[in-house]
Structure formats: structure tokens, C-alpha cells
Amino acid sequence: MSARMRVPTALLVAVALLLAGCSSGKKQQPKAAQTTSPPSTAAPAAGPLQLQLTTSAVGPERGFNPSQAAKRVTPDLQRFLTHYLTVAFLQPQQAKKGWKDFLAMFDPPVRASAKRQLDALALGSVAPKVTAVRPGRAGARATVLFSGNRPAAATVTISFDGTATTAQGSGPVRVHSVLQLVAGQPGWRIAAYDSKAGEDAR
């Protein structure tokens, strides 16, 4: 099962403009001033779900420290992505609440689409049959775009493997997604996605 929600035009324009500003004069800058950071790898999250997150940062060239920026933004991003996987796959009872907690992580313009595509984004229609999910490997790679001193957007590639238990036995749970995030108040929101679950996620 797969689902795709295109990035809204306004977001594409904003990211394009910011990237254009970031790349201005790039060839004239010394190597140390380049805006792509060495990966900053966060420690696994506490608890049964251990998400390995690698973060890079891109931003204005002058006065921007990509390594420090990546290190600073990683904890919040780690919490957001861990919560995303938790409510999507480790809490089958979310189905009884209409996936309210999960859908709240999406930007309002794409929530209706996400609700229609839960089978590719979360446990979806099989959730009522699932009694528990044992997490396996979980990994993510994020590139965060900064505007000034603040994160503005991020592209995240995230994968999760687990084992679901039902009354009939157990089976694999797999997802591979590319999430386009926007930063705001109170925090990160998913503005667009391309997600595959089950056999499609191989």
C-alpha cells in the first residue's frame, strides 16, 4: 500500500527561495563555510522504540554553523519522529479514537488526505485486529532547512520494521516514508508525504 501527498505550491516556493538565498556565493566560500553539516547522530530514544536519527542542517552561509544547528535541532526532531512512529504503529487503540493523535501531526490542509490513506501511513484498517506491536529497526535521516537561526522545514526519510500480534498469530509491519515537515507553533507538522507500507515498503 502506498500513498503520496504533494508538497503545497506555497511550501515549494518558500523552500526554493530559501535555498536560492543559501546557495548565493557558494563557490566563493571556503570549504569550512559550506552549509551542509556533517551528520549529527542522536542516541536511541528511551524505551522499547529506538529510533536512530541522523540530522544535517542547511542555512545561510555567512555566520551559520551547520554542525551546531544540526545538533541543536536533533532532540526536538527525534521526539517528533518517535511520537509519529509510536502513535502510528505501537498504539493500535488509536483507531478507536479516529486516529486523532496521529492526524494532529499533519498540517491542516493535508489531514483529510492522510485520513484516507491510513493504510499506507499507519496500522490503518488492520489496527482493530492488532493486540500489540513489537518494534524492530527504526531509522531516519533528516535534512533541516534553517531560516536565520530557526528551523523552517525538513525532509525526512524514515523506515520502521516491527511485528504485529493478533488473535490469529503474528506478522511483519513495515513502512518507508519521505516526510516534508514545516516548523511552526507549537512544533513540527507534516506538510506532505510519500509513504509505502507492507510489501511495498521493501
Which residues make up each language-model segment?
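Positively charged, low-complexity intrinsically disordered regions
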Residues: 5-7, 35, 63
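Bacterial N-terminal signal peptides that target proteins for export
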Residues: 1-11
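Structured, amphipathic secondary-structure segments that form assembly/contact surfaces
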Residues: 96-202
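C-terminal motif of bacterial Sec signal peptides marking the signal peptidase cleavage site
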Residues: 18-21
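Short, low-complexity, disordered segments immediately C-terminal to signal peptides
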Residues: 23-48
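Core segments of small alpha/beta cavity-forming domains
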Residues: 55-128
